[in-house]
Amino acid sequence: MTDERIHVLRDILLELHNGVSPESVQERFDATFTGVSAIEISLMEHELMNSDSGVTFEDVMELCDVHANLFKNAVKGVEVEDTEHPGHPVRVFKDENLALRAALIRVRRLLDTYESMEDEEMLAEMRKGLVRQMGLVGQFDRHYQRKEELFFPIMERYGHDSPPKVMWGVDDQIRELFQTAMETVKSLPEIPISTVKEAFEAVATEFESMIFKEESILLMILLESFTQDDWIQIAEESDAYGYAIIRPSEKWIPERKSFVEEKSAEEPVQLDTAEGQVQKIIDTPEGQFTITFTPKEKEAVLDRHSQQAFGNGYLSVEQANLILNHLPMEITFVNKDDIFQYYNDNTPADEMIFKRTPSQVGRNVELCHPPKYLDKVKTIMKGLRDGVKDKYEMWFKSESRGKFVHITYAAVHDESGEFQGVLEYVQDIQPYREIDTDYYRGIE
């Protein structure tokens, strides 16, 4: 990262700040930054934002389109073309940020107006409006959950495990700041409006900074790393977490291209020989070579409907799966290597107490939880592995869901007593708490 590049970037940003069109600086930007990664440019932008250069958050956000054009051709064709589709996860993510920023602006205007208002009747109505608008801002949690539960697991698979850890921690800080701000809004008029504005600006500042990090750093990493299949998986699993303020206006159905090409004349000639061996004739600059080998046998496909010895009886894999999915509880299994290996499917994802999606399977259990809960997760796993306890139990009442949630973490051992993992089962016990009789055997 050279000083010269930073100076050029600063000049371009200031020109944008003064009203020049992005198109007028595109050529100079391309000439200076071709070959520089999106990540490096984003770091330079971040450095300028935090200096006394005069560059603002809005300036950098405007430049995002400029360097997005630069990287458009470097990212695999169809994925980049589709990111502007209304249902593509990238477009949805950015549209949510626009809607959330608009909600922040509305709250800020309401607070300013409230501060100068004297009509008590109008003030009462404005307090209701503030709570409504803050409620809209509060939908950012759905946006963050999709990022944390759908984007981060795939990033980790590609080796980008540091940004998720840092960003998730900041997300939680923003959640806490928002809760504080919301409580102050609801405390009006008992507390000064200046206290409310201070709490709101604290969360708004961090919130806008996170939008920058998401669009100028996070999305650039994703566009350079993720495949079309990754984006399809994210799109399919997004409904489970919901959306912030807006929803996709239509479903994204990508154009799928076939990667299977017809055999050409240049391909090696393959000949079958006796005893299951195969010969291939390969053309090289030195002439033709013939190689002989035995192809690997295809593994037999498991018949999910064949009966297998199963505990005290017999079941097919299909029957075992159906039974697990019909148990009145959410089950998760983490194996002895701390890998999230399985969860049952007994309820739609958007109704689950603890949401699980296929993209989480295969993650280290420590990466499946917010940083603030990491110490507790480690303590539970170690306690069960070391035999300190056979199980840990927790419970809490969820007023918003009308549920009383009971959670059990139980050690799983094989017949020889060897630790094999941890079984988590979660259930709503509120219906049992409401039983008011000692006897019932009816079938109504």
Regions flagged by a language model, labelled:
Residues 1-141, 145-392, 396, 403-405, ...:
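Small-residue-biased structural context
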